[in-house]
Design a protein with these regions (language model features):
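Short, conserved micro-motifs enriched in small and acidic residues
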Residues: 1, 130-137, 284-292
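C-terminal, active-site-flanking charged/polar segments
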Residues: 270, 284-287, 291-308
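Ligand-site clamp/hinge motif
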Residues: 279-283
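Intrinsically disordered, low-complexity Ser/Thr/Pro-rich tracts
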Residues: 304, 319-322, 341-346
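Short, highly charged C-terminal tails/helix-capping segments
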Residues: 310-334
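Beta-lactam-recognizing serine transpeptidase/beta-lactamase-like catalytic domain environment
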Residues: 4-278, 330-353
């Protein structure tokens, strides 16, 4: 959920593209000794990410930046903003049994737990932990909305009945997501693209969390993909928060691996055509385990089914005419044209990242 928290922070003025924080590797509430550790650093570099802005916080998956941002945003802002992307709701057109997940709020906790909302609950929610949980279908839907720069495309199961195209009626229409500064959409897309495409920087000593795994994939990347790695909790990460070095869990208790992505990203002429959410049970690492699966699915759709030759499009303007004419859904001024979402709706989990 980090890209969505970041976009919400930009929209509501709690951060901007130039804001930099000093990340020591943990976050503390004012006057509280307890530390929320940076989960992504426990088995990585340790010691914090140092100076970090929102873009680096996304492509490096910096928990501490989002602890700070989420705390300042507050749960009311987080709840209302993430709800626009389908979290906590059934956004499908014809899947009545789809799980709604939980997008927690003060009212939800009081009603279900008979407890007040605490600041620590907000910090957990800022990285998709705590009481929040979502299905892969919700993650794919939210990712599609981000790819479409706010245009809501609701997923559906049924395409045709007895060979006749079927258009389900939208009984619960929702408004598109409106962002005051359109450049913030570009900024978030650029940040998610760096998750996949940013190589190691000698200057900043960092790289995109999925860069190495995607670079080792079987097929060379001929297009840009925007993505975000994550994990879904199976057991509590309290030990991680306390910076424990001796965590021993069975394979069945390992976190599930998650990766969301859409493509093509940052293309001058072709709008995003596909969004995916990959869920690998007990896979632990979203970037290295789920990331290559996401790329394989997107490769199959863009390169094999639509047969888009991105190399030709980059060098031959006339190639775009061939692509538009018969190999893919008609391109138009509607950013939702030809958009597809893919996901597995049967699993659920507490989403980390």
């Amino acid at each position: 959920v980090k890209p969505f928290i970041g976009l919400g922070g930009l929209q509501h003025g709690f951060t901007d593209q130039d804001t930099v924080i000093q990340d020591p590797g943990y976050f503390r509430l004012p006057g509280v000794r307890y530390r929320w550790g940076d989960y992504t650093l426990r088995t990585a570099i340790g010691g914090g990410h140092g100076e970090t802005n929102l873009q680096r916080a996304i492509f490096q998956s910096c928990d501490t930046f989002f602890y700070d941002l989420g705390y300042r945003m507050g749960i009311d802002t987080i709840h209302s903003f993430l709800g626009q992307f389908g979290f906590g709701q059934n956004f499908t057109l014809d899947v009545g049994y789809a799980r709604t997940g939980v997008l927690p709020s003060r009212e939800w906790k009081q009603a279900t737990r008979n407890e007040p909302w605490y600041p620590g609950d907000t910090i957990n929610s800022s990285i998709g932990q705590g009481y929040m949980w979502a299905t892969p279908l919700q993650l794919a839907t939210a990712t599609a909305i981000a790819a479409n720069k706010g245009v809501v495309v609701k997923p559906r199961m049924l395409a045709a009945v007895d060979g006749e195209p079927f258009e389900p009626q939208d009984l619960n229409p929702v408004a598109d997501v409106q962002i005051d500064n359109p450049d913030n959409w570009r900024y978030i897309e650029e940040s998610m693209t760096m998750v996949v495409h940013r190589p190691y920087s000698q200057v900043f000593r960092d790289y995109g969390t999925a860069y190495e795994a995607i670079a080792r994939a079987d097929r060379e990347m001929s297009y840009k993909m925007a993505g975000k790695s994550g994990s879904a909790q199976v057991v509590s990460i309290a030990q991680d928060i306390l910076q424990s070095e001796d965590i021993d869990v069975s394979d069945l208790n390992k976190d599930h691996a998650l990766f969301v992505a859409y493509a093509p990203a940052q293309h001058p002429t072709i709008k995003p055509q596909i969004a995916v959410a990959v869920f690998v049970e007990n896979g632990q690492h979203g970037s290295s385990v789920a990331g290559p699966v996401a790329k394989a699915v997107i490769d199959a759709y863009l390169l094999d089914i639509l047969q888009i030759d991105f190399t030709s499009l980059a060098t031959d303007p006339d190639a775009l005419l061939s692509f538009d004419a018969g190999r893919a859904p008609q391109q138009s001024t509607d950013p939702a044209a030809g958009f597809l979402t893919l996901a597995n709706a049967e699993h659920e989990g507490h989403v980390h990242d």
